[in-house]
Structures are given as structure tokens and as C-alpha cells.
Swiss-Prot record:
Keyword Lipid metabolism: no
EC nos: 3.1.1.74
Protein's recorded name: Putative cutinase
UniProt keyword Hydrolase, yes or no: yes
Reaction it catalyzes: cutin + H2O = cutin monomers
Bias kind Basic and acidic residues: ranges: 26-38
Length: 210
């Protein structure tokens, strides 16, 4: 059978057609339907094979940008109100994290105070063991921890439960979208390899038939 090669648009690879393949001219094609009277008409566009690889990555990057950035029109008030709430949350976390360093500084000060004050004071404090120091620090630790818990409870009473969460949702969304984009890229690689194999098989069969 005779083969006819027709070049495609935008520099895509040629398509081989047989003599029996009907070719419909542009004048006999049906007009395209429109969605709405005020919208643009749906036109058929030819996407080359070289741009298919960039399509999935572009859609994934645009979705990551939309998920990571804040909305400017619909939720502008909500985004501005959550800023000071996240500041309160960070303040609470810093308060909880600063309890242990404060206790450690106090313990180290009690241990190294003999070296600073002198020998007489060191003889007085030598009778105290490290266990006694730890026992003296336990009530202060309990008092600081209970005060921080009460402060967290008071602040959480004035906040919404949805807005008291830390701003980690955007990070998790970005990670999930990044993983999905990686899966899309792997699927596209598999599809391109399958298309290459099918093209090779078609070329082999066309050569054998010729």
C-alpha cells in the first residue's frame, strides 16, 4: 500500500497516512459549538509532542503556587486575621520551649555559684548534693509548666479551633502536590516510552508491508 507523509503543525513529527484514509477538507467540517453567547469559541488546537512533557509540570507548579500563596479576593479578611493568631501560637510555643532552658540556667547557676562566691560559700554548698538541687528545682518546674498550660488554655478560649492550628497545612499541601507532580512525571515518562515503542512497531510494520 502506498504511504503518504503529511507534515504536522508546530514542528511535530510527520503522520503517515495510507491511500484509503479519507481526508476531509476544511470547507466540509462542522462548525464548532460555543459554550455561551458572550464567551470565546472553542477552537481545536494542536499540541506538539515536545510540549507535552512541560504540560504536566506546568500544571503541578501552578497548583503548588495556588496552594502556597494566600487568596487575595475571597479570603483577604481571614488571612489578615490569622496573622496575629499565629503570632500568639508561636508565642505559646516559645514560652513552653523556654521553660527547660530557664531551669537549666538556674541549675547551672546553683552548681557554679561556689566558684564565683568564694571558698566559704563553697564549703556551705558542698554539703548539698546534686539530688538536693534537682529536688529543689522540681517545684519550680511544676509551677512554670502549670502557668504555661493555664496561659495556653486562656488564649485558646478566645480563638477558633481551626485557626489555632500551626501554619503547617500549606507545607503539607506543597509536599503532597510535589509528590503528585513526581508521579505525573513518572507516568508521562512511561507513556512517552510506550508511544516510542508503538511508533517503532508501526515503522517496522510499514516497512514490511512496503
Amino acid at each position: 500500500m502506498a504511504l503518504q507523509s503529511l507534515p504536522c503543525r508546530h514542528g511535530s513529527p510527520t503522520i503517515r497516512l495510507t491511500a484509503d484514509t479519507p481526508i476531509v477538507p476544511d470547507s466540509e467540517r462542522l462548525p464548532l459549538k460555543r459554550d455561551e453567547p458572550g464567551s470565546r469559541s472553542m477552537r481545536s488546537t494542536f499540541i506538539p509532542s515536545s510540549q507535552c512533557s512541560n504540560l504536566s509540570s506546568a500544571t503541578a507548579s501552578s497548583s503548588r503556587r495556588r496552594s502556597c500563596r494566600r487568596y487575595q479576593h475571597g479570603e483577604a479578611v481571614a488571612s489578615s486575621s490569622t496573622r496575629w493568631r499565629t503570632k500568639w501560637n508561636l508565642f505559646i510555643i516559645c514560652l513552653l520551649l523556654l521553660c527547660l532552658p530557664g531551669l537549666a540556667v538556674r541549675y547551672m547557676h546553683d552548681m557554679f555559684s561556689p566558684c564565683i562566691s568564694g571558698v566559704a560559700n563553697s564549703q556551705h554548698s558542698s554539703s548539698q548534693s546534686p539530688r538536693s538541687h534537682c529536688r529543689s528545682l522540681v517545684p519550680s518546674f511544676i509551677a512554670i509548666y502549670s502557668a504555661s498550660v493555664v496561659l495556653c488554655a486562656l488564649i485558646s478560649c478566645f480563638l477558633d479551633p481551626y485557626e489555632t492550628t500551626l501554619p503547617l497545612t500549606n507545607v503539607t499541601n506543597c509536599l503532597t502536590l510535589f509528590r503528585s507532580s513526581g508521579s505525573l512525571r513518572s507516568e508521562h515518562r512511561c507513556s512517552t516510552s510506550d508511544s516510542r515503542r508503538s511508533r517503532q512497531q508501526l515503522s517496522i510494520t510499514s516497512r514490511g508491508s512496503a
